């Protein structure tokens, strides 16, 4: 009886901790629906890694409002990362199935099926650990984002916090880093190239003339006309 009582106390304690953590995440999402996040979990992790080698290391990032971001870049990102962004409620099960089949065929992870909302959930709150708990938490956060925020707000935050190169985060910093212009002035071709870099931004920052990057840029250009933006 003694052990049973303590088991339930410990169990309920862990349930309470999980509930409090979920509530904290939810409150952050509600707050960020009205106020811009100054950083993200991924940005902080990246900065800590950089400062292990250089204590003065800093990230290059500058917030730019949604209406000032080039429509070309919005279309390019949706065409490249989440063609059904406006249609789904956080998860594109067709893309997940396609990625699973392709990875199974190749015998290794070569394609992801994450939506923009899922990617934002990871960027804002989670570590890079690939565990069942992390995937479950990602799903919960994705649902919260979709319920609290509009698609426009999700895309706005996404474009401002994702990594786009070595110490480069967000569309404005990326446009200035690669082209010396504001994200408001990015052309179709420049937007497609920036979108093509998203899966491996640090690699493409150092290898900007790889044939695969050029090929992927052309593929994205071909899809942009059919991409719908919020």
From Swiss-Prot:
GO terms for cellular component: peptidoglycan-based cell wall; plasma membrane. Pfam families: Transgly. This is Biosynthetic peptidoglycan transglycosylase. The keyword Mitochondrion does not apply. GO terms for biological process: cell wall organization; peptidoglycan biosynthetic process; regulation of cell shape. It catalyses: [GlcNAc-(1->4)-Mur2Ac(oyl-L-Ala-gamma-D-Glu-L-Lys-D-Ala-D-Ala)](n)-di-trans,octa-cis-undecaprenyl diphosphate + beta-D-GlcNAc-(1->4)-Mur2Ac(oyl-L-Ala-gamma-D-Glu-L-Lys-D-Ala-D-Ala)-di-trans,octa-cis-undecaprenyl diphosphate = [GlcNAc-(1->4)-Mur2Ac(oyl-L-Ala-gamma-D-Glu-L-Lys-D-Ala-D-Ala)](n+1)-di-trans,octa-cis-undecaprenyl diphosphate + di-trans,octa-cis-undecaprenyl diphosphate + H(+). Its main location: membrane. Pathway: Cell wall biogenesis; peptidoglycan biosynthesis. PANTHER family: BIOSYNTHETIC PEPTIDOGLYCAN TRANSGLYCOSYLASE (PTHR30400:SF0), MONOFUNCTIONAL BIOSYNTHETIC PEPTIDOGLYCAN TRANSGLYCOSYLASE (PTHR30400). Peptidoglycan polymerase that catalyzes glycan chain elongation from lipid-linked precursors. Its EC number is 2.4.99.28. NCBIfam families: mono_pep_trsgly. One of its GO terms (molecular function) is pentosyltransferase activity. It is a single-pass membrane protein. Belongs to the glycosyltransferase 51 family. The keyword Cell wall biogenesis/degradation applies. It is found in: Cell inner membrane. The chain crosses the membrane at residues 10-30. Keywords: Cell inner membrane, Cell membrane, Cell shape, Cell wall biogenesis/degradation, Glycosyltransferase, Membrane, Peptidoglycan synthesis, Transferase, Transmembrane, Transmembrane helix. Disulfide bonds: none annotated. SUPFAM superfamilies: Lysozyme-like (SSF53955). HAMAP family: PGT_MtgA.
């Amino acid at each position: 009886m003694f052990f049973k009582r303590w088991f339930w106390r410990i169990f309920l304690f862990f349930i309470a901790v999980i509930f409090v953590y979920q509530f904290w995440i939810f409150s952050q999402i509600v707050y960020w629906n009205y106020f811009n996040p100054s950083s993200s979990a991924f940005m902080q992790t990246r900065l800590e890694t950089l400062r292990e080698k250089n204590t003065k290391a800093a990230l290059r990032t500058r917030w730019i409002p949604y209406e000032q971001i080039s429509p070309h870049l919005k279309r390019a990102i949706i065409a490249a990362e989440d063609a059904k962004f406006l249609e789904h409620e956080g998860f594109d099960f067709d893309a997940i199935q396609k990625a699973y089949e392709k990875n199974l065929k190749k015998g290794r992870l070569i394609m992801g099926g994450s939506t923009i909302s899922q990617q934002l959930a990871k960027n804002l709150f989670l570590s890079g650990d690939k565990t069942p708990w992390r995937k479950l938490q990602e799903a919960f956060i994705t649902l919260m984002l979709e319920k609290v925020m509009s698609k426009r707000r999700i895309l706005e935050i996404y474009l401002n916090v994702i990594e786009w190169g070595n110490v480069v985060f967000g569309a404005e910093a990326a446009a200035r880093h690669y082209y010396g212009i504001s994200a408001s002035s990015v052309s179709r071709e420049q937007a497609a190239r920036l979108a093509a870099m998203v899966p491996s931004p640090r690699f493409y920052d150092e290898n900007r003339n790889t044939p695969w990057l050029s090929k992927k840029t052309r593929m994205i250009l071909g899809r942009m006309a059919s991409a719908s933006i919020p």
